Amino acid sequence: MRGQIKILNKFIYVAMIVVVGFTSLGLTSNENEKKIHSNITIENIDVGKLTKKQAIKKLEAKYPLKDFYITWGNEKWAIEAKSIDLDYHIEERVNEAFNYTRDTSMLENIKRKGKLKLKKSHNIRLKATYDEIKLSKELKVICRAINVDAVDASFHVELSGEIKRTKSKEGKKVDLSRLKENIYDMINKKKIENINLPVLTSYPKVSTEQVKSINSILGQFSTSFNDSTSRGSNIHVAGESTSDILLMPGETFSYNKRTGARNWVNGYKSAPIIVGGKVTNGEGGGVCQVSTTIYNAALLSGLTIDEVHNHSLPSKYAPKGRDATVSYGYTDLKFTNPYTHPVYIKNIVGNGAITSKIYGCNLDRERISIRMIEEYTKNKITVQTYRLYLDEENNIVRKEL
């Protein structure tokens, strides 16, 4: 009996809350008036006691969908709001405000109204959206108008020996990530205004000052060959592919990388080569004479030799221990520019000879002498090649193996 009385009391209590809710909170009057409940704000703008139409008008006056400009100096580009589908979704947020005290259960609606009556306001944020793909298309137009690649300075030696230089130029590039970030921040703040175009300066990899520093021949070496043979043809091809190369400070030269595979596709013919201590025919015969010539020029120029291999048989075109055999994919000739200035490799091929010259800054020029020490055993000769650095009185100040 007591349990039934408790249930009845709870029912009466709930019923009283509902009745009080209907009367004291004025549910029916708000519903009939079709207005947003008081103390509801959108983006901290009071829309309470307004119809949806009135609220939309008020918010659109505060947050119009305006076009904006991206400016750079005297240049400017218009970005239309409609072209990027810019939208604050005001109508959706107004509907949310209108339904705040209507779209949940009766008790929850009463609870929300109670808080609003107690001056506890409810704020709804506007969410700005735009089409990123469409914006990117607009920004590409700006980038095409602004972006200019930096131009490297160049250094070239004609066959006549005449030196030609061109100057470097700085480039410019739109900082696209920063520009997009600025637009994103502006739109999210819903404060449409013009944006300054962020432009970065791009610098050339090779400057005018660097090529100006090339004013001297650091070292050179020549070898002879029969110009009228397939081997001679291969020397021409390899000599051209490894010539006119600007090697920046710290940069490494790779013979195999410059020539590529020595096959008929790259212009090489079959000619005598040394394989396993024997002379036979193979594609690219003669390329080792080019690598040997360049190697000796690099030795005399003080460049750092990273990789070099000798033939299994002595070469006719170079002293013992100063040849450089190469085999694509296996053995290579590599050296690095150790100086703070660039060096330039120039090969001159013709009239039965190939000459490799390495140009650089006269401040880097060393007095270098090459010395070979031969060691004879029963079956072979071993040659050790030393690079000697000399002072003005020809005293050895440093030597390298």
Map each language-model feature to its residues.
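Well-ordered beta-sheet/strand-loop patches within structured domains
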Residues: 2-3, 141, 149, 157-158, ...
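Intrinsically disordered, low-complexity N-terminal regions enriched in serine/proline/glycine
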Residues: 12, 87, 97-99, 375, ...
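N-terminal Sec-pathway targeting helices
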Residues: 2-16
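Functionally constrained cores in energy, signaling, and assembly domains
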Residues: 10, 128, 165, 298, ...
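Short glycine/threonine-rich beta-strand-turn micro-motifs
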Residues: 33-272, 277
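Hydrophobic membrane-insertion alpha-helices, especially the h-region
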Residues: 12-26
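Membrane-interface motif at the C-terminal end of an N-terminal transmembrane signal
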Residues: 22-36
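Generic N-terminal leader/processing signal
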Residues: 4, 8, 104-107, 145, ...
